[in-house]
Amino acid sequence: MGNVATRKRPGCHHHIGRNEENLDDDEDGPAKKRLRIGEPQAENEYQKLAFKSRLQKLKKCRPHLKRRTYKVEEADPRPPVPRFIVDDYGDYEKPEPTRKEFAIPWFEHLFLPEFPTRSVINEKSFVLERQLGRGSFGVVYCASAIHDSERKFAIKMQEKREIISKRAVLQVKREASIQRLLPSHPFIARTYSTWQTRTHLYSLLQYPTGSTGDLFSVWRQRGSLSEAAIRLIGAELASAIDFLHQNDVIYRDVKLENVVLDQWGHALLIDFGLAKKLKQGSSTGTICGTLQYMSPDVASGGTYSHYVDWWSLGVLLHILLTGIYPYPNSEATHHANLKFIDYSTPIGCSREFANLMDRMLAVSITHRLCSFTVLHAHPFFRSIDFSKLEQKDYTPAAEIGNAEYDTYHKSEDALDDALFKENYDVSCGRNVIFAVLPVFW
């Protein structure tokens, strides 16, 4: 038959028989593991071996080195926006952060443009001296400028976390907007600048040097005031309230704690947290304010307008003379529990003051004093010339002034006026104290 060439099946030359491989292993001695992998996979294996080798050497050189483990959370493609701010996500609920001590480092856009992120004036320009008060969202400090320690200001620091958690973003922005757009008035505390950082909102406010504190502290320390002191305080606050009403602002929180006395005893209205833009002739129905100063119109849940501020002013004047509330509401904890019966008529006062209280605190709106024009013409304020009142030509009673300032000087007001005019652009009606410069957080 001859030599017949055996044909190989296609692909047989690519195979290495298992038996043949075992024979090679037996010939070499112990079985050896041979890597039959591609080049990329082999390179990856070599990198792992090299990493293990370096790690072992590092452990030998540094025996005190401890292995730290980190919990890697799955990335969420959606932005970390609270449910009550953006409702487009349906049933999406962001879990609570594990480290609550860290404040929220975002949401700058929520507070723009009332609180810009870049400002010439920032928290590093002042030295905090003492705490003046604490509010729902932060603290108010008395501060002095670094370049001039004698100039005093009030700096309000509000936490973004508290504002967002209590859903008060619009309220805080409304307060800052009203104060920034409001023109200057001698009996309203001015707002010089506002800005924000990653965690806080800041407001630079007027605070008179040598102030005796708020009206509540003065009344608590010195007791009931004389009618002469009450007359001037009432006239100055009435002028401030009428100025707000003329600028379509309803205040809604007139009380002793929101009035600060300067070193000479003149009144300054502060804290616009509950103020609201409201045009003349319009009405609103939000139930807000301090319970003991709340008018029947607000407590009943109906609609009301600017005239509720005059009721609150009447309660304030009544407390300054008698030391008690005009109605038995000192223990009330809800607006539904307020009682407007058993009116406490002031005793030991002049007939004019008693008549003023009767008219300002009348439950019926038809018999109540509800305008500045009527109050201006009341006999109790006959000795006050309201045209000269804003020039502070009247000297307050010595019982409410600061003994260290026995004479009145207008240099302080001149500095404040210059600063305010520099920071207020009448043409556009906006506070332009801040320029576009970086603030390093």
Swiss-Prot record:
Residues 126-381 form the Protein kinase domain. Its EC number is 2.7.11.1. ATP binds at residues 132-140, 156. Signal peptide: none annotated. It catalyses: L-seryl-[protein] + ATP = O-phospho-L-seryl-[protein] + ADP + H(+); L-threonyl-[protein] + ATP = O-phospho-L-threonyl-[protein] + ADP + H(+). GO terms for molecular function: ATP binding; protein kinase activity; protein serine kinase activity; protein serine/threonine kinase activity. Residues 1-16 have a biased composition (Basic residues). CDD domains: STKc_AGC (cd05123). It is an enzyme of class 2 (transferase). It holds the Pfam family Pkinase. The keyword Repeat does not apply. Keywords: ATP-binding, Kinase, Nucleotide-binding, Serine/threonine-protein kinase, Transferase. Belongs to the protein kinase superfamily. Ser/Thr protein kinase family. This is Putative serine/threonine-protein kinase F31E3.2. It comes from Caenorhabditis elegans.
